[in-house]
UniProtKB/Swiss-Prot annotation:
One GO BP: proton motive force-driven plasma membrane ATP synthesis
Gene name for this UniProt entry: atpB
PROSITE patterns given in the database record: ATPASE_ALPHA_BETA
Gene3D superfamilies tied to this protein: 3.40.50.12240
Protein name per UniProt: V-type ATP synthase beta chain
SUPFAM superfamilies, alphabetized: C-terminal domain of alpha and beta subunits of F1 ATP synthase, P-loop containing nucleoside triphosphate hydrolases
Keyword Ion transport annotated: yes
CDD domains tied to this protein: ATP-synt_V_A-type_beta_C (cd18112), ATP-synt_V_A-type_beta_N (cd18118), V_A-ATPase_B (cd01135)
Amino acid sequence: MDLVTRRIRGALGIAGPLLFLEGVPRARLGEVVRIRGEPEAHGRAAEERSGQVIALSRDRIAVQVLEETRGLAPARAEVTLTGQVARLGVSRGMLGRVLDGLGRPADGLPPPVPEARPAIHGAALNVTRREKPSDFIETGVSAIDGMNTLVRGQKLPVFSCAGLPASRLAAQIVCQARVRGGEPFAVVFAAMGSPFREYHAFLDAFRAAGVLDRTVVFLNRAEDPPIERLMTPRCALTCAEHLAFAHGLHVLVVLTDVTSYCEALREVALAREEVPGRRGYPGYMYTDLATIFERAGRVRGRPGSLTQLPVLTMPDDDLTHPIPDLTGYITEGQIVLSRDLDRRGVYPPIDVLPSLSRLMGLGAGPGKTRDDHRPVADQLYAFYARGRDVRRMAAIVGAANLGEEEKRLLAFADAFEDELVGQGGTFRTIEDTLEAGWRLLSGFPPAALTRIPERLLRARPARPAAGAAALSGGAVA
């Protein structure tokens, strides 16, 4: 071993994407290494691969190779330890760029000129420097903006089931999201383990909506190495932190699919022969996910914010599966997609009853959205919950045997799903959402609107005479 360059010739062996070395006393966890095989035929130089130290045991190390290891002979491999951890060159010039999962250009353009090169394994925000999340990010989706408001600095995951249009919803939010008041806003989008069709569908959607110039795209493909999948969200967050806290932008980070990330984490852990935890996932998965999600927030004294909207697929539609279960402990609510609503053709199929934004009160209401936001949302939620109960009862006794009040609630539940939740791919402002909510509530007498203060009811314009009877006929006027 060369003590200056720390170059090692020869390796113990290879197991899948892992390269094992010995006689490396000064290696560091997370250190970047360069790997070169024997020269190819016709005198051509050997291809150089890169990797990262992921395990240490005395003077032995395990290196995760970022490229494939096929054709690499362990005995002839030459490994150079750089002494550096993984870093990413970041700048405001990354806006409008399409990058691979490691932050390298994937759009055929030169690399952005870096303003800084921070380590991608950044720490969570210092709790003593955190500012309370406030103000909302308008996604244009009524079930989120109206019922589960996304607040700047929040981490709000989307829980989906296999086959549901979670990717379509993620792309729609990237295209529609904005902040009020003309403040600078950007989106960082990171896809992990995306198949070919989905990979291009995202890019086509962003280009068609004309939002690529305010977006940084990180795309990790399904065929890329698992270690790259583990680095993709960290590269995206490193870029987002620079835009938010160095340039004062309000940044929304959309991560999809976190389940692909966790599968890669399990694959690497099994390759390292670690003792598995629940469902075969490593016991430190909670801590690992926390190092990603806890990078969201606001910093006291700085104008920007970093908001996260991670999307994950629940294996077997199981909300108690380790991935959604642990994610729910770290984050501040959840948006749940429903297979039943999707079967009925409702898009986006967001089930508002199990969905929750724990920080909604910090971004909705007087001075944030509208004075009537929380009361209207609470009243809609209450009627919809009762309507769902009536729907289950009607499946047993028959709709014809329901009373007038039950029929009105049943009609409201149907109209709520079709008119408010099922908006399709259109953009709705928060004003449009609240007015749609008021139209649904117009089918009830004022005395039934117990969640709405009297002053707000008096401030509303007179309702049409047909309004009180609108829901009794099963439709919303």
